[in-house]
Amino acid sequence: MAGTAAPQAGSFLLTIFLRHDETKTVEQRNEHLRQTGWYDKFPPEGVEIVAGYVMMGIGQVVILRVPAEKLRDTNRVIEQTAWGGYRTEFYPTYDFKPVREAIPHHRP
């Protein structure tokens, strides 16, 4: 995984919550993901995983750098492969750290 969330022209960051389907065991979920091709198709070509985390009680959270023209491909891969194994939520995202560091801080 790349370690920087720096913006690139023509792309945006997309945070995806992949919430576990708790009606399935881990083995059932993994089998579903194998059958649908999740491991081979995600992320789609041209889309970069910037960060990924496992969050206990939630599932996985993945931050992608998505070229604008790849948004539909990203959506379709998730619809075709992740649904049934995960409930999904999407959040357009930006890296606030450089913004915060540019704000003058007044200290007593």
What are these regions, as identified by a protein language model?
Residues M1-G59, V66-R72, R76, Y94-P108:
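Short S/T/G/P-rich N-terminal loop/turn motif that feeds into the first structured element of a domain
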Residues R76-W83:
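Short, intrinsically disordered, mixed-charge
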Residues W83-D95:
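Conserved short beta-strand edge segments in small beta-sheet-based binding/regulatory domains
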